[in-house]
């Protein structure tokens, strides 16, 4: 019985997260090299933005303003991460959202995609997905882009939305 109790206590100790570990996560370094924003495929991103703003305007919503700074730097960083994974991912969205909020954003949303080779095709896919459409039609004022093409020609997209 003593051995069973000791084994149970060891198991419980191994599966618990300490307060120190939580604190480390909460104070993660959210700094970014703003020059990463320059690595996005701006002609493709501008076309995506034009299509999204046309859609928003048709609904009576204000268009989004492109953020060529922090939001795009974080979007490019995430797109590079997805390219490394060779798949789309929302991993660490909370960190990107927190970083943008630290820079004045009130609310933040994100759409990701891969494999679309035109702006129209990725926007159509997002509009046909309720959760992605919600971001496109959301109460946001600005947007940042991480649009990148791999060596094999496959596009990856990260679009961050935020309200100032």
PLM regions: where:
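Functional surface patches built around histidine and acidic residues
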Residues: 16-164
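Classic N-terminal secretory signal peptides
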Residues: 6-8
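Bacterial N-terminal signal peptides that target proteins for export
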Residues: 1-4
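C-terminal motif of bacterial Sec signal peptides marking the signal peptidase cleavage site
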Residues: 11-15
């Amino acid at each position: 019985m003593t051995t069973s109790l000791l084994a149970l206590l060891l198991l419980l100790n191994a599966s618990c997260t300490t307060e120190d570990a939580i604190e480390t996560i909460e104070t993660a370094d959210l700094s970014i090299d703003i020059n990463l924003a320059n690595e996005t495929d701006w002609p493709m991103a501008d076309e995506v933005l034009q299509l999204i703003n046309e859609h928003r305007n048709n609904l009576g919503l204000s268009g989004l303003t492109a953020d060529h700074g922090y939001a795009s730097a974080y979007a490019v960083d995430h797109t590079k991460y997805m390219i490394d994974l060779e798949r789309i991912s929302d991993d660490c969205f909370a960190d990107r959202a927190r970083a943008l909020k630290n820079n004045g954003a009130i609310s933040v949303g994100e759409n990701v995609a891969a494999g679309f080779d035109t702006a129209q095709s990725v926007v159509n896919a997002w509009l046909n997905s309720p959760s992605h459409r919600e971001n496109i039609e959301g109460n946001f004022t600005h947007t940042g882009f991480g649009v990148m093409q791999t060596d094999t020609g496959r596009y990856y997209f990260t679009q961050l939305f935020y309200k100032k």
